[in-house]
Amino acid sequence: MIELKNVSRSFDGKKVLDSFSAVFDKGGYLLKGPSGIGKTTCIMLILGLLKPDAGEIIKPEGIRFAVCFQENRLFEKETVLTNVTAVNENILEADAASAITELLPSDTLNKKAGALSGGMKRRLAVVRAMLHDSDCVILDEPFTGLNDEARTKTIAFIKEHLNGRLLIITSHDERGLNDLRAVHIDPAGD
């Protein structure tokens, strides 16, 4: 379980989160709000990449996160297959390849990640996060750049590979995510 208690965070004097509280237990959550409201800031606080100005963040000691950031952070010079096997030493190459080909064509397995299109890179980043050995998966705007068909397949892939872990997705587009528990971020000061 991850809990945020009255968390506030400002940047350059502008308050982004103001006394925000939420509890994330096992299962899936959709962190909702319009673009620029503070969803990514909330994620960065949960991950410990930012510190709150006020409030408290409670999470289990040693919790392992798998993250798909808004910007694809892939090993561009490595193959698609290596990008996935590198984050989980327990996964067999055949299992990784099978999972990858649920979202990407099989002829991409041995291509360099840097050679993929933007949408393919996004799907690879999601596969890598979902196959990472973790307790909590965080996907920050995972559907950016995906057409409707790729989005639908990616949502199904995420749900299939959740395996009882905590999932936090940020998205301004809720299509296909109505079974996730919604956590709303309101404008700071409201």
List PLM regions with ranges:
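Conserved ABC ATPase "signature" region
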Residues: 93-109
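Walker B catalytic motif
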Residues: 112, 141-142
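Hydrophobic anchor residue at the start of the ABC signature
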Residues: 126
